[in-house]
Swiss-Prot record:
GO terms for cellular component: mitochondrial inner membrane; respiratory chain complex III. This is Cytochrome b. The main subunits of complex b-c1 are: cytochrome b, cytochrome c1 and the Rieske protein. It comes from Sarcophyton glaucum. Binds 2 heme b groups non-covalently. InterPro entries: Cyt_b/b6_C, Cyt_b/b6_C_sf, Cyt_b/b6_N, Cytb/b6-like_sf, Cytochrome_b, Cytochrome_b_C_euk/bac, Cytochrome_b_N_euk/bac, Di-haem_cyt_TM. The chain crosses the membrane at residues 39-59, 83-104, 119-139, 184-204, 232-252, 294-314, 326-346, 353-374. GO terms for biological process: mitochondrial electron transport, ubiquinol to cytochrome c.
Length: 386
């Protein structure tokens, strides 16, 4: 049996194991972080699950317009445990985005965006995730896949002067075709590895800047080692997430999908209502709330990029919303607004959904551009009053 000293020496001095040790074992972590800090490790788990299931699915998938739909059927019916691979991959993507939204919400609530490098890399990861998920949604080559690809890629035609050329360049022709499916499959296979690389940068920059905590104050004098205090906490979160994923995949595998995608893509028949997956619906609702095409596209893009402005428009002397009652109220209004926009995105483009969507979109941008700086200034002023 090896002595503890030798084990410690290997753990801390080995060129590769020491990196893992610094991330998972001896990492100094604030002593008061809550379960909201679990979602970083859960996102790592989701990414690994998506990579493994995606690689195995790619072994049986055919990126050809005449074979793609049938190859999905082949995976479900003929491949050993193929149905589990497909449903874990599809529902795993939903849980991935759910964890991302909670992770980002925690960052907004506790002011984690003040660590700019960590936050900016996180926003870039989110953008690449959205692109990857969109590319993957096209691959089953069902009706919603085909028409979703047609509608979303057509937004690029709103770019002045070169829009039409850009769309045809993306399509590889004059419509969504075999060339489109091929390049979407190729990029969908590539981007998760890019996300993994950005994830490593995210973790490295986090360890350089140090973790935030629920109080939003410097915690350098009160830290504990990551193992054993938070590894077991993370394991509990992993068990809960795994249980939810297994229940989804076995008992309701298609609950988050669209029935239209059980019909093979037909360029001659348009679905009654075209909509993306649930995790894009808030941005889709913002896009549709503006009647001008270019304006809608800009609003949709800016709804994500506005997150990059947060470190510059934070005016409060307090980082977290823990001790900011006005900021707390505004934040929970934002959460309600996000849920409302998600619901509106799944509804048809008609009244009263259009008008409600316009008000909800207006509040979304007002929160970031008006309420965050205004309430920060107001609360700081009130704190200084004697």
């Amino acid at each position: 049996m090896e002595s503890p000293n030798k084990m410690l020496r290997v753990r801390t001095q080995h060129p590769i194991i020491s990196i893992v040790n610094g991330v998972l074992v001896d990492l100094p972590a604030p002593s008061n972080i809550s379960y909201y800090w679990n979602f970083g490790s859960l996102l790592g788990l989701c990414l690994v699950i998506q990579l493994i299931t995606g690689i195995f699915l790619a072994m049986h998938y055919c990126p050809d317009v005449s074979l793609a739909f049938d190859s999905i059927s082949h995976i479900l019916r003929d491949v050993n445990h193929g149905f589990m691979l497909k449903y874990i991959h599809a529902n795993g993507a939903s849980l991935f985005f759910l964890c991302v939204y909670i992770h980002m919400g925690r960052g907004l609530y506790y002011g984690s965006y003040m660590k700019m490098d960590v936050w900016n890399i996180g926003v870039i990861i989110y953008l690449v995730m959205m692109l990857t998920a969109f590319l993957g949604y096209v691959l089953p080559w069902g009706q919603m896949s085909f028409w979703g690809a047609t509608v979303i890629t057509n937004f690029c035609s709103a770019i002045p002067y070169v829009g039409t050329d850009v769309v045809q360049w993306i399509w590889g022709g004059f419509s969504v075709s075999n060339a489109t499916l091929n390049r979407f499959f190729s990029l969908h296979y590539l981007f998760p590895f890019l996300i993994a690389g950005l994830g490593v940068l995210h973790i490295l920059s986090l360890h350089t800047a140090g973790s935030n905590n629920p109080l939003g104050i410097d915690s350098n004098i009160d830290k504990v080692t990551f193992h054993v205090y938070y590894t077991y906490k993370d394991l509990f979160g992993i068990m809960v997430l795994s249980s939810i994923l297994v229940i989804l995949c076995y008992f309701m595998p298609n609950v988050l999908g669209d029935p239209e995608n059980f019909i093979q893509a037909n360029p001659l028949v348009t679905p009654v209502h075209i909509q993306p997956e649930w995790y894009f619906l808030f941005a889709y609702a913002i896009l549709r709330s503006i009647p001008n095409k270019l304006g809608g596209v800009l609003a949709m893009v800016f709804s994500i990029l506005v997150l990059l402005l947060l470190p510059f428009i934070h005016t409060s002397k307090l980082r977290a919303l823990t001790f900011r009652p006005l900021g707390k109220i505004a934040f929970w209004f934002l959460v309600a607004d996000f849920i409302l926009l998600t619901w509106l995105g799944a509804n048809p483009v008609e009244e009263p959904y259009i008008m409600i969507g316009q008000f909800a979109s207006l509040f979304y941008f007002c929160y970031f551009l008006v309420l965050v700086p205004l309430l920060g200034w107001a609360e700081t002023t009130l704190l200084r009053m004697k």
